[in-house]
Amino acid sequence: MSSKLIRGTFILTLGTFISKFLGLFYVIPFDDLLKGHEEGASLYQYGYVPYTIFLTVATAGVPLAVSKFVSKYNAIGEYAVGRKLFKSGLVLMTLTGIVSFLIMYAFAPIFAEMTIKSDEQVISVAQVTTVIRAVSFALIIIPFMSLIRGFFQGHQSMGPTAVSQVIEQIVRITFLLGGIYVVLNILDGTVTTAISVATFAAFVGGLASLGALIWYWFKRKPHLDELLEEDRGNEEISLKAMYKEIIAYSIPFIFVGLANPLFQLVDQITFNTAMADIGNAKVSDHAFAVLNFYTHKLVIIPVSLATAFSMTLIPLITTSYTSGDRKTMRRNIDQTFQILLFLTVPAALGLALLAEPMYTLFYHSDPLGTSILRSYAPVAILFALFAVTAAILQGIDEQKFTIFSLLVGLLLKLVLNIPLIRLFETQGAVLATTIGYAVAILINLYVIKKYARYQFRLILRRTMFIGALNAAMAGVVLVLYGVLVKFLSPETGFQSIILVAICGGVGALVYFYLSLRSKLADKLFGDKISKIRSKLRIG
């Protein structure tokens, strides 16, 4: 791999990490600003779930596909092909963005009525309509902006994407938090106005990101024009042929990108109905916020970290499959699954074990939040497994099954959600998500087994071993936590920080030691870990 590509990948990974970090930790001041307005988080999420789905459909995976397309033709010196697609793509993304905005804005009352099912709820249809309309403006600009990122990435120029992502998050979060503070504390406005300003921040952040990308465009344009002059001109590809190739490539990414938002949408349109059926309409808005906003933000942490590591092996799977090297392909699949489980399982388990101080640390003490986080945390393993199995299917050119497995999982979620919520309240929604994702993953695993002729014997053995290491870690953490809570309260913020730092730190050290002692880490991460183990004189 060239040093330029390694540097670019590092820059992009760093930018993505900073962006995700900011996207997680803003919820601490966000929750603090909404004290006395607990319905604010629910209202925010009611607007954001439809927006995420509309945004995914509006972009249709085109920016990522353009990145691959431009890279492919640049590699053979056909620079004009990529530029032609870029110009056309900008027009297309502008049109799809505007159309998506108009549809979302016009149909906001219908989406709101699908969400709010009872007059006893704290939040009204009118409030949800206002918030959905406020966030819909971002659709005008984000697809257009995303395509420019894709074009730069296709030229192995990751800096513009990384910098624009960070700028977008900083501006969005600053506007979001500042807007809530000004509306509630200075203007003495309503929580609806405050949350409308908060969701409109997506548009403002998008503008800032676009500004950064335009600056990069003018800075890099002389170099890009030089490449055009070197164009070989051997390939004459029509826009129809280009988009045919792009659509074939992007459809699976659309569905994978939609997986989590669609599961959340099922909750949004069924949760309040089920809660009203069992007489819990008054608390359903708060329970929804705990489920789909507060705990979900925490559950996604281990997913983001683990998939970032394991996904780096996916291109190797694609290469070995394309070249017919099945032995290398199977070894890469082994490695992908093992790294995923090695990282995700302890993170999810730690989140479940320390659910009460973690929830208090990020938000405030809440028995419902603790309960939901404890049961929801292990689902992170399923989120990560679905993303990685879907990527492997893409690597072995069987991506059509990703769509099938997701639809089956969604159907199960839709069928089971209301009955399970009636039986177990908010926990029922977590259980329905677990079942839906588990079945979707089983389908993906079966397809991998059949078409990659992959045997899961090693993974099953390794999973049991990783489970044993985690059981040992959990035992130590539970004993330590039991002792510490006699002196520290997980219901207060500062003491929760101490609990999480000590228990989490000791748990991580125990797991790290056991993985070194057993030489599991050596097998997964190679010589560098072996050298560390030797220096520490472990094993």
Which ranges hold each PLM region?
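N-terminal membrane topogenesis motif
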Residues: 1-25, 80, 84, 234-257, ...
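Signature of the first transmembrane helix
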Residues: 4-64, 72, 101, 105, ...
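Specific pore-lining/lateral-gate transmembrane helices of multi-pass inner-membrane transport
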Residues: 72-89, 290-377
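Short membrane-interface helical motifs at transmembrane helix boundaries
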Residues: 101-123, 185, 348-364
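Alpha-helical transmembrane segments of multi-pass membrane proteins
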Residues: 119-147, 365-389
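Membrane-interface junctions at transmembrane-helix termini in multi-pass inner-membrane proteins
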Residues: 141-164, 378-406, 423
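Membrane-interface helix-loop junctions in multi-pass transport and translocation proteins
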Residues: 159, 173-216, 410-442, 449, ...
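Membrane-proximal transmembrane or re-entrant/amphipathic helices at the cytosolic face
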Residues: 479-539
